[in-house]
Amino acid sequence: MRKNVQVLVFLAGLGATIANGEPPATKHVDVASIAPRPDDVATIDGMIQAWYDVISGPAGKARDWARDRTLYIPNLRFVSVEVENGQLRPRIRDHQEYVDSSDAALMKGFFEKEIHRVTERFGPIAHVWSTYESRVTENGPVTARGINSIELFWDGKRWWIANGIWTEETRDNPIPRKYLSSSKS
């Protein structure tokens, strides 16, 4: 999910350091602070729907990063696991780093849709395995599939996403059948 873009790793007290030897993204995207939409944060379904809604859209459509930010705890970490030069590498970002590094790519047209979900919950914590497929245009061919692993917690008033980690399906790492059945659980 939140994919294939330059990534910075934030090192506390040291500022931004390049994770993969590439120059940092040069475009900073200002993200306003707004109140969350009640429907987004009231249920796990609302949270996951918002997760996908925010990053999806046609070419030229600005993404609603302010809405996106309302879904996450302040110290959230996004981790994408990618294959680079035959090696698995994590790309670790906070929300601002993700926005700065992916906004331009998403503005070229990107749609991600959940095709299966497994949710496990224990009291105020939940884990969601969300299988997705991506397209450049809303009804275009599937360009990628993968799984988002999303950790959430309930604070008594609303849900929060604490972490998100994802990876794309590859020939050597196909999505297991249990994450592809036709119904969400």
Ranges and model annotations:
Residues 21-70, 179-184:
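Short, low-complexity N-terminal intrinsically disordered segments enriched in polar/charged residues
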Residues 82, 130-132, 148, 165-166:
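A mature extracytoplasmic/lumenal domain signature
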Residues 36, 56, 76-90:
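A short gly/proline-enriched turn/hairpin at secondary-structure junctions
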Residues 6-16:
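Bacterial N-terminal signal peptides
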Residues 22-27, 145-174:
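Short beta-strand edge/turn micro-motifs at domain boundaries
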Residues 51, 68, 76, 128, ...:
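Hydrophobic pocket/interface hotspot
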Residues 1-4:
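Positively charged n-region of N-terminal signal peptides that target proteins for export
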Residues 77-78, 87-141:
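Surface-exposed, charged secondary-structure patches
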